[in-house]
Design a protein with these regions (language model features):
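A shared catalytic/ligand-binding motif for oxyanion handling
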Residues: 1-230
């Protein structure tokens, strides 16, 4: 099983839909979680043969917007729950004959809304009754090593780490480089804003799972490629 999590800023840019379609094909993706604005026309260009079941949360102004898709031949969608910052799908995995959850998140870039996002994150994860992964652009750093410049202490960082510990989630190690986002300046700021977390019982389903950072294309975030290691 393979999946992609990516904040593809500028999804409406020329060539972005073609790029996404190529990523799905080249990496034989079974699920995707994407961020930014999308239109039905864009989705048709990404998935011209209708191989995926798509769900989305519309963008609000210049921010927000989540698109999540799973292949019809691999998964059956049991339920879908849409919050302000999180799109939660519970699927039946036809290959392993188990149910599990895919939560795609897009945390607020504004400090004043980060607690609201974290409350939603804690609530949705706490209510999961099946194994699950939660991934996306959290827009929160976990520690000072996740930024190439000086970082001020943050209440949201403390709350985020507390939630991860309370829920016994584990971050899947990302190979290919430490940082996932850049501001593309002459002396760039580099940060790790994107990540994928898993519950203990999801790791038991896929003990060989790993995540690899792909080359940055048409966005200031790198795509994250998850593989079950099978």
């Amino acid at each position: 099983m393979r999946g992609l999590i990516w904040n593809c800023r500028g999804a409406g840019k020329k060539g972005m839909a073609t790029c996404l379609s190529a990523l799905i094909s080249d990496h034989s993706l079974d699920f995707v979680g994407l961020h930014k604005k999308f239109s039905p026309k864009c989705i048709r260009r990404i998935d011209p043969f209708g191989l995926f079941h798509w769900e989305w949360i519309p963008s609000a102004g210049k921010s927000g917007g989540i698109l999540s898709g799973v292949r019809h031949d691999i998964f059956y969608v049991i339920s879908c729950n849409k919050g302000k910052y999180i799109l939660q799908m519970v699927v039946h995995d036809k290959k392993i004959k188990k149910d599990w959850g895919l939560l795609v998140v897009y945390g607020s870039t504004h400090e004043e809304f980060k607690e609201e996002f974290l409350v939603e994150l804690a609530a949705m994860c706490s209510n999961m009754s099946v194994p699950y992964i939660v991934g996306g652009d959290f827009n929160i750093l976990r520690n000072c090593n996740e930024k190439n410049k000086m970082m001020n202490s943050s209440r949201s960082t403390d709350i985020f780490n507390s939630i991860i510990n309370a829920l016994a989630l584990r971050e899947i190690y990302t190979s290919g480089g430490k940082y996932i986002w850049t501001n593309n300046q002459a002396h760039p700021t580099l940060e790790k804003l994107d990540r994928i977390l898993m519950s203990e019982d999801w790791e038991n389903l896929f003990p060989m799972v790993y995540v690899r950072k792909l080359v940055q294309e048409l966005s200031d975030h790198n795509p994250l490629l998850l593989s079950s290691g099978e």
